[in-house]
Amino acid sequence: MRQLKKSASRSMLALFALAFCLPLPVQAADDGERFRDIYEREWDFRLREFPLFASYVGVHDYDDVLGRVSESDQARGHAVWKSIAAELGEISCERLSHDDCIDYRIFAKQIDNFIAEYETRAYLLTFNSDGGFFMEWGRLPEETRFRDVQDYRNYLARLHEL
């Protein structure tokens, strides 16, 4: 009887240990999926907020707009990036794959930089040694594709926004 009790206790202990370990891979998968969802949502936001950048990376959904840069637009972007940072804070890099962890760290740094640029009001600088708000306009003809009538219409729509 004692032997049976010991065996049952060991089995229960092993079962408990196994049950304790099982949620970790599920959590890792959940964190990986959450991370992908976060960066995909942020990427869509980034393309909408920076249509010239979208065109540059080959996304032509916003070829007819320049983007908005008012104080309220800056504040809205800041709120989105603060929210993204909070969501990222709920994900542990240790629960991600090695490659996702690297991507996570790079992405988190980009988000931190967007937040810092707003908080230091860097958007008020019209130009610096790296570029500037108005400099993008001068490159519009070079960076616009002119393959069909719609491309010309998109270009004219952007010029109209100036």
Region locations from a protein language model:
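Bacterial N-terminal signal peptides that target proteins for export
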Residues: R2-A14
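Sec/Tat signal peptide C-region and signal peptidase I cleavage site
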Residues: L24-A28
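Bacterial N-terminal signal peptides
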Residues: S11-P23
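Non-catalytic accessory/assembly modules
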Residues: A29-L162
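Generic N-terminal simple sequence motifs
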Residues: K6, A19-C21, L47
